[in-house]
Amino acid sequence: MGKGKKGGKRMNKAQLTEILQQFFAERPGETLSFKEIFRSLHLTTHPLKMLAIDIMEEMAWDDYLAKVSDNSYRLNQSVQVMEGKFVRKANGKNSVIPDGEENPIFVSERNSMGALNGDRVEFTFLARRKNHIKEAQVNKILERAKDTFVGRLKVDKDLAYLVTPSDVFAHNIIIPRRKVKGGKTDDKAVVRIIEWPDGENKSPIGEVVDILGQKGDNDVEMNSILAQYGLPYKYPKNVEDAANKISGEITEQDYKEREDFRKVFTCTIDPKDAKDFDDALSIQRLENGNWQVGVHIADVSHYVTEGSIIDKEAVKRATSVYLVDRTIPMLPERLCNFICSLRPNEEKLAYSVIFELDNNAEVKNYRIVHTVIESDRRYKYEEVQELLEANGVVDGTGEPAPAETKEHPYEGENALQLITLDRLAKKLRAARFKNGAVKFDREELHFDVDEKGKPVSCYYKRSKDANKLVEEFMLLANRTVAESIGKVKKGKKPKTLPYRIHDNPDPQKLETLREFVVKFGYKIKTEGTKGATARSLNKLMSDCEGKPENNLIQMVALRAMMKAKYSVHNIGHFGLAFEYYTHFTSPIRRYPDTMVHRLLTKYAQGGRSANEKHYEELCEHCSDMEQIAQNAERDSIKYKMVEFMGDKLGEEFDAHISGITSYGIYATIDENHCEGMIPMRDIADDYYDFDEKNFCLIGRRHHNKYQLGDAIRIKVAQANLEKKQLDFALAGDSAPVRKEKPAASTSSKKTKKSKQKTRNHRRNK
């Protein structure tokens, strides 16, 4: 900084505070005397020196500085120098999340050192200013989250640029012409950084790795979403070649070593567009009157050897990714859709949990075994639902079909087996909720797309009894497998296993939920045992079911819940009310399930406990990849939402407020469930304050209020596909009306002048 800027008479306290913060942050280990500070910052006048001393004293009170002597200070490193993850936001509200904490700390752009979203950084706290939020300053970028980025190319004569969303880079990436790889303006491209910025205003330099194609093409846009999150949009040829060499033949040795379930009624029940069938159910009546139910899971670990090229690719991916119009599988297509998939009328290898259940669905005994099965029928959820309802089931009531009689036999192919499975599943479900499981039945947005991937309709999809039938038996199998390894005699250490864990809700977020639902006339307990909290949540879900605010309350309630994740350190699963729970039932699309299969086999053969540290690292990786896959899925939904509304500009719709922020209102259209934002700048009738605690905006002058859940009328104002952003405007009776100020009379003008004089007089005192 120049002398004039640092030592000039016009420098105020805020400016000098910022200069001192930066000065100490750049010299973390040094003790600095007043003399050195004044000389380095060119503070030549007595008032500036005195102001600097006062500021440093305040910084010491804030623990930003440590006082070494009467005339020297140093940065308080023991308190201030920390590490964490940087979070970049498009609106400029960047933050850093310290390691081991959840609450973000604001970082202004000038203090970010050009850190990118997800980068690991070293940072220091800035001294708090009066009435100012806690701030941090990035001092060092420890590790970049990634080095490849997706954007739109702009190719000029001498240089090219990659235009990226503002939440990725503050500046575009410069690409030398020789590194463009034939890309043209408006091509979507993947670019690798070859030179990182070393200053706030310097753009990064990159090279094109892959040209995805022209923007706007459906395949290009979906692949862009995958590439943006570092997810693979191509399957490596060498991995596919390895998969093509795997034989799907079942050998005589396989038949000898496995239980044979080929003659027992078995079926798969899946979504209508499913191709990878990784679970099947079998059922038969035992001589003692009980039911034998088999939960049969594709035996992926039989075909995918640990450490093989296919396994390494599966570890890297960790999960299949489900975008609106496509699935990006964890395993090569030959394995996931053919060899491993439990296709009808084909003999398949499975890993099975075989239960003996009485008529109350109580487990009398079980065994976990390798099997050979042959599915008799591939059912779609809709087909099973139709069969259940044709035999007297009323969806959502929890009641099974009436008993079969000679006069009223069950209708439909395999009706007895499917209705019995449904009846047992409903008993299991009732017992689970009685035990304290939390009931969330939030609807999911789905799109129907044409052959070009363009959305033609969108709708909410709700889980029905047919879905719940399958879900309950999968939950039972997962819990049973976890108990078989984790539940040991007191004093004995269980062998290593990846668990699916879910911690208790955050008490503070539960209190926020309580305050929110009170406005709709509901109550919730935030204190007491886990069971009491769960029962209270379930009552809330039951009370608001079918009401306009149902989805909204479910959304806010979900925010109060902790995220489920994988870990070898078991703490139970709050949402399901299980002490032991794992993922065993989907090895085609989830890598943790494959890990569990391998460990079960190892332990069944008398193997020693697996390396805990190694499996915990794998669990963390799988949890991270699950979150990344969910983010990509959400982005594909946002893109299709904007695309669907793109030809409806200017049209008006009824909507409900689904989110309130300091920068605008989120609204969901009642008719098609598409969500957009009404920017704060467009609500022009007043200046609105954001009341975070009460989820509302309140006008300062006219006291108009916009509350979460309010019914409003909106107009589609803008549909920006590149940003995946829908902008709405308030319309009809909801539109803001700017109230004109009454003309000021002469006397009122005098009063105004008099008040201004009084204010100026007070200011000058």
Which residues does each PLM region occupy?
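Acidic, low-complexity intrinsically disordered tails
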Residues: 1-14, 687-696, 731-765
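Charge-lined substrate channels and their catalytic hotspots, especially those that engage the 3′ end
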Residues: 2-294, 301-347, 378, 385-386, ...
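Electropositive polyanion-binding surfaces
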Residues: 39, 190, 195-197, 214, ...
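Residue-level marker of beta-strand positions
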Residues: 64, 120, 188, 362, ...
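A short macromolecule-binding patch
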Residues: 103-108, 169-175, 673-690
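Intrinsically disordered, low-complexity linker and terminal regions at domain boundaries
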Residues: 119, 679-722, 726, 738-743, ...
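Short, surface-exposed secondary-structure boundary micro-motifs
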Residues: 126, 194, 658, 717-719
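Internal insertion modules embedded within essential enzymes
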Residues: 151, 201, 717-731
